[in-house]
Amino acid sequence: MKVRASVKKICRNCKIIRRKNIIRVICSNDPKHKQRQG
């Protein structure tokens, strides 16, 4: 899980999801692409 100021999709399988005002990126293809804004 990377914590970044700006989250972006890294590959085409990445999905941007908003949970409790936290923006996250979830990737089914590569777990290294998981990110959270903070």
From Swiss-Prot:
GO terms for molecular function: structural constituent of ribosome. Keywords: Ribonucleoprotein, Ribosomal protein. It comes from the Bacteria. One of its GO terms (cellular component) is cytoplasm. InterPro entries: Ribosomal_bL36, Ribosomal_bL36_sp. GO terms for biological process: translation. PANTHER family: 50S RIBOSOMAL PROTEIN L36, CHLOROPLASTIC (PTHR42888), LARGE RIBOSOMAL SUBUNIT PROTEIN BL36C (PTHR42888:SF1). Belongs to the bacterial ribosomal protein bL36 family. This is Large ribosomal subunit protein bL36. It comes from Buchnera aphidicola subsp. Cinara cedri (strain Cc).
